[in-house]
């Protein structure tokens, strides 16, 4: 989750019929319940490998001083840096194909994607996804979220713009297989149900879109809320067994739970304006970052109650989860602007669940 967003928290007075408004009853945990380590400037998304027993963090480094970026390999227990993989292009989004142990990083500024061998740290290849030159009239699509289908060795990448698309990349050849067009304005959210051959995306038009990965065709698109208000469904995470999608909204103080089979809203969970979301099937919980509030929420996915919050100032950004579902990782950004860069590196937090 690496684009900058403005959040406008506001309370909801009324709800759609059949949906739930869930009051937040939670406990706030102190900093001593977490391990926090400074890593590097420009921290964004993470990827976790059970096989390598490692966590990777994409960092864009300094805007002014560094042309490229660094991917850090971290010890998942101590969060100490065990390897620094320097890149001439800045990495932002991240995912891993667990079958091939290939890391994939979105190079947002350059409209490209880079593949890295998780074991060696060697760059396996790179693909420019939108080669158009940026002008006042032309805005190349920018890679945002990445998901890997281990069964087919296919990488799906959301290309964000006024008219977004999803790139479908062959993980073996690192070549573009096809492009799924017309996914709406700022189509950032991306989640995959490999067994069901379904890909889901969300956008700033307030839509939930279902795609058939066998044909790479859009099957359905549904505007989730028809309340006359602005919504930006910025990220989503799936409970594939329960046919649910947890969806964050950067324009509203609630998290939506949607039935992936029909797009119907199952619940509205009261929470601060949100950014990243990650479902944990082991604990039947969902975790959500609230950038402006400086917190991470833990949602009981059975009751839809917010049961815990972690204070994670300044700006909690992205989430990653260990394969056993017992450890949560959070990337946390310091306050930084184009005029005044942060003087301290960004952090990674390890939370024992």
Curated annotation (Swiss-Prot):
KW DNA-binding (keyword) present: no
Coiled coil: none
Keyword tags: Signal
Signal peptide (UniProt feature, chain positions): 1-30
InterPro entries: Haem_d1_sf, Host-pathogen_enzymatic-act, WD40/YVTN_repeat-like_dom_sf, YNCE-like_beta-prop
Pfam families, alphabetized: YNCE
Signal as UniProt keyword: yes
Protein name as catalogued: Uncharacterized protein YncE
